[in-house]
UniProtKB/Swiss-Prot annotation:
Participates in chromosomal partition during cell division. May act via the formation of a condensin-like complex containing Smc and ScpB that pull DNA away from mid-cell into both cell halves. One of its GO terms (biological process) is chromosome segregation. HAMAP family: ScpA. It is found in: Cytoplasm. InterPro entries: ScpA, ScpA-like_C. Belongs to the ScpA family. Keywords: Cell cycle, Cell division, Chromosome partition, Cytoplasm. NCBIfam families: PRK00104.1-2. Transmembrane segments: none annotated. Component of a cohesin-like complex composed of ScpA, ScpB and the Smc homodimer, in which ScpA and ScpB bind to the head domain of Smc. The presence of the three proteins is required for the association of the complex with DNA. One of its GO terms (cellular component) is cytoplasm. This is Segregation and condensation protein A.
Length: 239
């Protein structure tokens, strides 16, 4: 199965998406939290064996430098803004935000004209998966990134080392369906409580997306960065 996420135009676009969730001025966002979310997102894509462009990895290394500097003791000397990688990053984000707004306005004008002459492009991707309150598939991946990081830490502590590769999405779709036998709603992280390795978690996650895509379940996230819940569709029987 080919998986394609929402196309970001580059690492700044991904960072701007994360920053926008806080609904505050760019210079007031909790940058350490944003960095951790970015790194978790990239790590999840790598674990799922999805290709990550070099520019995203370069940004990841720069973010790790910024994060490490924040962990160091504060120094008395005034830091030159030109030598501050954190301020430089925020400046880049602000400039990119302005550029993106202008590009979107121009794009809307172009699309208006194009609709009269051509058919819109159809992509078979998971970007059409929508959550409540205007959430997107990227929010699902961010939530899954957090769950997977927690589960990996737990597996390391329990010294679990057995990994299998033969998990099938079809089987895991049946597994997800079975979890609704006790009720119509469950938390995403509950699906992974008994997972024994990362491959199993990834297959369960992909199975969940597939069930959303075929409208057997819907996903809800009632607050930014909050837990995601799976809700059985009223139009489908999952038993």
């Amino acid at each position: 199965m080919d998986i394609k996420l929402k196309d970001f135009e580059g690492p700044l676009d991904l960072l701007l998406h994360l920053v926008s969730k806080y609904q505050v001025d760019i210079y007031e966002v909790p940058i350490t939290e944003v960095i951790e979310q970015y790194l978790a997102y990239i790590a999840t894509l790598q674990a799922m064996r999805l290709e990550v462009a070099g520019e995203y990895m370069l940004m990841a290394s720069q973010l790790m430098v910024i994060k490490s500097r924040r962990l160091l003791p504060k120094v008395v000397e005034q830091i030159d803004p030109e030598d501050d990688p954190e301020m430089d990053l925020l400046d880049q984000l602000e400039e990119y935000r302005k550029f993106k707004l202008l590009s979107e306005k121009l794009g809307e004008q172009h699309d208006e004209r194009a609709n009269y002459f051509s058919k819109p492009k159809l992509d078979l991707i998971y970007d059409d998966v929508q959550l409540a309150k205007d959430k997107t598939v990227i929010d699902i991946f961010l939530a899954f990134s957090k769950v997977m990081a927690e589960k990996q830490a737990s597996l390391r502590q329990s010294h679990a080392t057995i990994a299998r590769d033969e998990y099938k999405i079809e089987d895991m779709m049946d597994f997800v369906r079975s979890r609704f036998e006790t009720g119509p709603r469950l938390e995403l992280r509950q699906l992974f409580q008994e997972s024994q390795d990362v491959n199993e978690m990834i297959t369960i996650f992909l199975a969940t997306l597939e069930l959303v895509k075929v409208h057997e379940i819907v996903l809800e996230q009632t607050e930014t960065f909050g837990d995601i819940y799976l809700v059985r569709s009223e139009d489908e029987s999952l038993s």
